[in-house]
């Protein structure tokens, strides 16, 4: 029954989960990102990650087949002040699923830093957000090394336009789409069903079943559903 409930909302089996996650990301990029950039007053956003040391925001902006940065991965977003449309760019290599959501702007022979500098010249933004924050660890994912490399690579005029992007990244994280809300309701129902079973006499044997047994039963059910 749990599998049927998840399958009805596209959250089971694992292949369906992948399709669903891509659709959720597509919706967020199209619905939430333009609003977040406008509301925060930024017309450019750079999200920089390094292999084995990802910015926490990075995983919320990429597809299921590219959950971790490759060498140096840079995502760039430019909001057109006239149309409100956001150009989504991937600097460096990207996965097949990413091809449908991001423009690959790398030119032959360019390094990621040369490419980033060129994009900034093309877009000429007035306010550039990077993930630095005094208040939120989740919005403070830009490493000191990458920040120095970025400043060294771009033109001096753009260095002066870089600002801490907490106002943008918080808005990106906090706003959910209708599809996300629907899936949350599904997961909530499944969670209650798991609790109802593991706390019932269908599973618990008085005097024998321990709280640890209940914990492992919950983990097993969740794992069998393709989650962890």
PLM-predicted stretches and their roles:
Residues 1-223, 227:
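A composition/biophysics-driven feature that prefers long, compositionally simple stretches
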